[in-house]
Amino acid sequence: MIGLFSNSSVQYVKAHKITREKTDVQVQITVTIKLKKIMDVQNLQVKLVSNLRGFNQIDKRWVKSYVELWGIPDQVAILLKRFTGEESPTIADPRDHRRMFADEFSVNDQKSILDFLKNNKAMIVNDILKGRGKLAAEWMLVVQKIDRDARWVLKPMNFAINHFGNGDIVITTQGSFRIGKITVQRKGGDGGRDTAKMLQFKINPAELFDV
């Protein structure tokens, strides 16, 4: 970003931490060009990785929030709630008494969910990675630290969207959904609290080091 300007023109750089938005850090760069001060603002999403396969949450919400955001049909919303455990399983002997895995749904129900994801793929991937509005993230910064070694990579968010969103929409062998390189799963954990029933999207941001 600063590389867009000559070092001599940059007066100062400020970084502001943003909470509850896709942008984690907003960088303000003040430059002087032909005696005029210009402020350039860039929004960064920061991902910290501590292992080689650093799967990282990029979004999690209650299903009802995604219904409001994406206009998910009622029937698909009910299926997603069974997937996360907000609604009880409707089959005999589910693998987990708390919820249903994607491959435990009927063929027609699987198709309903997959069709919704396919028809709305661009919007979904854009929203969970970039976000909307003035605080939409424009860059993805990945910082990986393993033992004493550290490295970082900075990519335009549109590059990250194309990379992680590229690929088929499928049901995984673990019974979750996958949109390209994005895993869609029940959040789980949280010591059994209700928040374990949220829908979660995850990526491996370390992939950006190799593309």
Q: Which residues make up each language-model segment?
A:
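Short, positively charged
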Residues: 1-23, 27-211
